[in-house]
Swiss-Prot record:
Pfam families: Ribosomal_L18p
Top-level lineage group: Bacteria
Source organism of this protein record: Leptospira interrogans serogroup Icterohaemorrhagiae serovar Lai (strain 56601)
Function: This is one of the proteins that bind and probably mediate the attachment of the 5S RNA into the large ribosomal subunit, where it forms part of the central protuberance.
Family, similarity comment: Belongs to the universal ribosomal protein uL18 family.
Keyword rRNA-binding: yes
NCBIfam families per the UniProt record, alphabetical: L18_bact (TIGR00060)
UniProt entry keywords in alphabetical sequence: Ribonucleoprotein, Ribosomal protein, RNA-binding, rRNA-binding
UniProt protein name: Large ribosomal subunit protein uL18
Length: 122
């Protein structure tokens, strides 16, 4: 139990530390990646104005991923392309990736690759 609590606290501290650094730079919008047990979601947030510019999730009815699952690497890559398209419609080209304390590997790396392929710069 203590190990789980320590792991959770460590992840929260990593997320806060990275968000503090991103907000300190603050000139570009943040691209936030969120993993849940069933779905993946992301949003582009402008911290200066405090608004969400674009949002995408694998739980949308219009979402069609590469595989059967809505939370694997294939779905993450398609989600990255989708958020890049929605961001470009709002005029967003450059963002800062907020990993929420997670390491840049697996689904997050696939998500970033899909977003870069579709034209987002970070």
């Amino acid at each position: 139990m203590i190990d789980r609590l320590k792991k959770s606290i460590s992840k929260t501290k990593r997320a806060e530390r990275s968000r503090f650094k991103l907000k300190k730079l603050g000139s570009r919008p943040r691209l936030v990646f969120i993993k849940s047990n069933q779905y993946l979601s992301c949003q582009i947030i402008d911290d200066i104005q405090g608004v969400t510019l674009a949002y995408a999730t694998t739980s949308e009815k219009t979402f069609t991923g590469e595989g059967k699952s809505k939370k694997d690497k294939g779905a993450a890559k398609v989600l990255g392309k989708l958020i890049a398209e929605r961001g470009s419609q709002k005029g967003v080209k450059q963002v800062m990736l907020d990993r929420s304390g997670m390491i840049f590997h697996g689904r997050i790396a696939a998500f970033a690759e899909g977003a870069r392929e579709a034209g987002l710069e970070f």
